[in-house]
Amino acid sequence: MARERDDDACPGALQTHQAADGELARVRLPGGVLTAAQLDALANAATEFGTATLELTSRANLQIRGIRDTGAVAAALAEAGLLPSPTHERVRNILASPLSGRHGGVCDTRDLAHALDSALQRDPDLVRLPGRFVFGIDDGRGDISGLGTDVGVHVLDAHTVALLLAGRDTGVRVPLHDAVDELLRVARRFTEIRGTAWRVGELADPAELLGQREPTAPPGKTWPASVRPPVGWIEQDDGRIALGAAVPLGVLDARVAQYLAAVQAPLAVTPWRSVLLFDLDEGVADVALRVLAPLGLIFD
């Protein structure tokens, strides 16, 4: 059921939320991806202007709480490359299989997530999306499709994806190379018909978003929600190591974030409030594990 009002106060990095402990900024990380330098910049901003913690959200974003100078935080985020589009910063909600291209999955969807983010920022109509609207890209393993994103694709094979609405298979099949266009088409249609709805599941008939698309497979399939984050020592398909660490209560001390950044490896935040370090050789992974585990991160 849609809400009677359309007051979308969903916070971003520029439109912050006044919480009991001060201003709260939510930083979108499409696909959960960020660099070591970006994590370090976030940790420094949280230390200098906030509560010296970073909160991990169920949408693989990060939050800074208790902000005393919102302008300074926004400037720090922009300098770190975390605000590529001030107009679209609240709508860059993209969940993607965090281990894709490195461990398991039907195919590597990292480029797909990046292309979706880039195309989303270029579309002036999509600035009207609610801040709660979420895209999903599942590389076939079923980790993201079970999270009930508003519109998503689930890879079936190297050439085909299933189109999902509110976490449910519509029966519509789309060529993999058309997936971004299809996701954006559905999102545009949502802005046209949503009324006061913030999420696809609030529409009286989500199938209206399909337009002329006809299902070619039985619709209705859902995927179970994944509750266990990818943690521990994970051998990548290329022989290198990924380390997965659960963050207790989803609250990451800024000092611990700085230690994570010091590993100088690609990172991802997951929807299960964990962090992944990628592309490590065994020696570096072993040292990182020995340093990070005593700091309160959970690797098992």
Feature map (PLM): residue ranges:
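Intrinsically disordered, low-complexity polar/charged tails and linkers
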Residues: M1-T16, Q38, R228-I234, L243
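Accessory "access/gating" subregions that flank catalytic or transport cores
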Residues: G211-G250
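A conserved active-site cap/scaffold subdomain adjacent to cofactor or substrate pockets
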Residues: V180-L183, A187-I193, R240-A242
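Small-residue-enriched alpha-helical segments and adjacent helix-cap loops
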Residues: A2-R3, A19-L164, D169, R173-D181, ...
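Flexible, glycine/charged-enriched surface loops at secondary-structure junctions
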Residues: T53-L56, L126-P130, T191-L210, T216-V227, ...
